[in-house]
């Protein structure tokens, strides 16, 4: 795939954290989630800026599941919470850390999301579910003249999909590197891919398909 000039390109590593891998089996493990670092690093070579998002939660979060309120059970009365989840990506734990092979110092901009106890966003562009409270990443990309964003991360069918759609709605061209993503379930991955394709997202199988201008 022919790319625009490098100065117009950013590479986005979405929630590539241990919490979404078998490294943390009691959190939200995604099969092979710890095997995408090489592809994320490869796609970053085609970009002038490298950005990342990370879930950054606390043990006081109102969406935490327990024996009375199991995972995926609905939450009422909180506009920025939809369902319950097991504890994951708690700040200061192994789950919060990047997956092996990613260097925190390699990034130009990072988003920490879900810090507030009453918010559990999926996309990395907004802190709320209504896409109103900006994380600043859209503005950062615009200020730096970025027009195209190459994306990968975890998980395809949740945070990756939502972030990609937010970027498209903000007017960016988006390329999703399939080899730099892993998802939770075949049916939800397929649905996410269809939704992203309908929004105009372009797909590559891996970073070797990218071609510099």
Predicted regions and their residues:
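Active-site acidic carboxylates
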Residues: 1-115, 143, 147, 169-176, ...
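Short acidic/polar alpha-helix capping motifs at helix-coil junctions
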Residues: 63-64, 126-130, 157-158
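Short, surface-exposed loop/turn motifs that are enriched in glycine and acidic residues
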Residues: 87-92, 126-131, 153
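Histidine/lysine/aspartate-rich catalytic loop segments that bind and position anionic ligands
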Residues: 104-144
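Short active-site-adjacent structural elements
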Residues: 120, 158-162, 183-186, 212
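Glycine-rich anion-binding loop/nest that anchors nucleotide
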Residues: 146-162, 176-181
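Gly/Ala-rich phosphate-binding loop of Rossmann-like dinucleotide-binding domains
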Residues: 164, 168
């Amino acid at each position: 795939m022919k790319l625009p000039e490098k100065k117009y390109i950013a590479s986005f590593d979405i929630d590539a954290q241990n919490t979404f891998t078998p490294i943390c089996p009691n959190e939200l493990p995604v099969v092979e989630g710890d095997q995408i670092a090489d592809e994320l690093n490869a796609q970053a070579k085609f970009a002038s800026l490298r950005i990342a998002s990370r879930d950054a939660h606390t043990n006081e979060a109102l969406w935490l599941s327990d024996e009375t309120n199991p995972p995926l059970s609905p939450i009422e009365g909180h506009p920025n919470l939809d369902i319950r989840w097991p504890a994951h990506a708690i700040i200061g734990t192994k789950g919060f850390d990047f997956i092996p092979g990613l260097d925190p110092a390699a990034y130009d901009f990072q988003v920490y999301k879900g810090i507030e106890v009453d918010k559990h966003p999926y996309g990395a562009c907004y802190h709320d579910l209504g896409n109103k409270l900006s994380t600043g990443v859209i503005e950062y990309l615009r200020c730096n003249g970025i027009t195209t964003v190459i994306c990968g991360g975890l998980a395809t069918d949740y945070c990756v999909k939502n972030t990609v759609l937010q970027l498209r709605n903000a007017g960016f061209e988006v390329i999703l590197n399939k080899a730099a993503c892993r998802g939770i379930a075949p049916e939800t991955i397929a649905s996410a891919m269809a939704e992203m394709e309908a929004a105009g997202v372009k797909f590559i199988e891996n970073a070797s398909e990218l071609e510099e201008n």
